[in-house]
Amino acid sequence: MALVVLLAVFTVATMQAAADYGIVINGYSVWEKNCNDLSGIKGVTGSVKYDPATKTLTLENATITGIGKERCLFNSECEGLRIVLKGSNRIVNNEEVGMEFRSATTICGPGTLDIRTNKKEAILFIYVPLTIEDCEITINSENTGIVGGFISEKSVLTVRNSRVDVNAKNGCVVYFGGIVLEDCAIVQPKGVVFDKGCMSLAIDGEIVKGRLLIGKPNYAISVAGVAVTKDNCNDLSVIDGVSGIVKYDGITRTLTLENATIAPGKSTVGIFNADCNDLTINVIG
């Protein structure tokens, strides 16, 4: 009888372990019994659900408010987790970390995410890569923003075609292994680089605190009242009032006009160089 009971307990424990997907929300594990609707978890509103087949956690117009000393969202061992944002989403935690990742995670759009923390990090990723793509994330933290947790080359942050606006008193993007920017750039402040000395985004060796903005690069030039960006720089003739060949090379800082006409509307400047040092305007024809 004792052996039967022991085997029964072991079987139940094994089943529970197999059903646990390695994701925790406000201290509650995500598993097969609740994954289709996680809005029943205390502190969660809106639509939150998990698909174990694709390892996709979807937040749709959702708010996760931290409860006590619990992290709002914790990926402990779901390797390759994708967090899909739909609509406007919020994570608020006054006591603990907003989001913590100990397995490789991707946060992706098309929606937005607003993270607010008071005492701890907004996003913490430890010894693993973190990817942010095709979305908008706004962070406001009385402590730190995006943090690698431990200084490790494995903690690489990739930001792809996204806007990440970090406001953090004690450091915006700090203590991580490196950064990869694709179809976006550090827009503000100027002069920010990844500093291997402090393993953080810094200016002249000083960690950036306050505000740091990653977004679509703006070349500080406008043509017929329209900002020149990475999206439109190869063909500026699509701008109203512009004809012929007008294009901009962000690497050489060269604006080329070839048999072009720029006829902006009333009170609009044809070409305005707001802050592009060493701009060259190449006129052909």
Language-model-detected regions and their locations in the chain:
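A composition-driven surface/loop motif
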Residues: 16-285
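Sec-dependent, cleavable N-terminal signal peptides
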Residues: 1-19
